[in-house]
């Protein structure tokens, strides 16, 4: 499972021109589910995301986590995070999980993050074309992969 975390001043998701979710200050998290992902990937990523100190403290240092502040979260599924560009110029998405595998794992990530943070998480809509709007804060953008725990 791979996530791209962006610290934002605001973010929203629209489907066919209709806004379906929005947040103010917080994190936009893009989630890509891989064919081999399982519950342990969710558990590791949720713990990492919740404790990641990427918000500024009173001195301006990135020393504060989602658990420490009242920030919003919006999670959006994005299978293209598992694109392979090794051969040719057209990306391959063979490593991305099919919907029957990806949907329960994506929803499991959202549910687990809600439990970890004790707050409602806003989401996109799985499997449809979305318009994601955001204002980056920083910018701060971090990629984390449960299969490559650096």
Regions found by a protein language model. Name each.
Residues 1-88, 97, 103-150:
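N-terminal, polar/charged subdomain of small-to-medium soluble alpha/beta proteins
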Residues 93:
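Glycine-rich, phosphate-binding/catalytic loops in enzymes
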């Amino acid at each position: 499972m791979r996530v791209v975390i962006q610290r934002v001043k605001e973010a929203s998701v629209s489907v066919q021109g209709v806004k379906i979710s929005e947040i103010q200050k917080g994190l936009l998290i893009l989630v890509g589910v891989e064919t081999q992902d399982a519950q342990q990937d969710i558990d590791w990523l949720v713990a990492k995301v919740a404790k990641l100190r990427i918000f500024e403290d009173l001195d301006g240092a990135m020393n504060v986590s989602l658990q420490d502040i009242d920030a919003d979260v919006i999670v959006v599924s994005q299978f293209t995070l598992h694109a392979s560009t090794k051969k040719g110029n057209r990306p391959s998405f063979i490593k991305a999980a099919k919907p029957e595998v990806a949907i329960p794992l994506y929803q499991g990530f959202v549910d687990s993050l809600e439990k970890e943070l004790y707050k409602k998480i806003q989401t996109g809509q799985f499997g449809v074309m979305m318009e994601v709007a955001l204002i980056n804060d920083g910018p701060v953008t971090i990629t984390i992969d449960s299969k490559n725990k650096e």
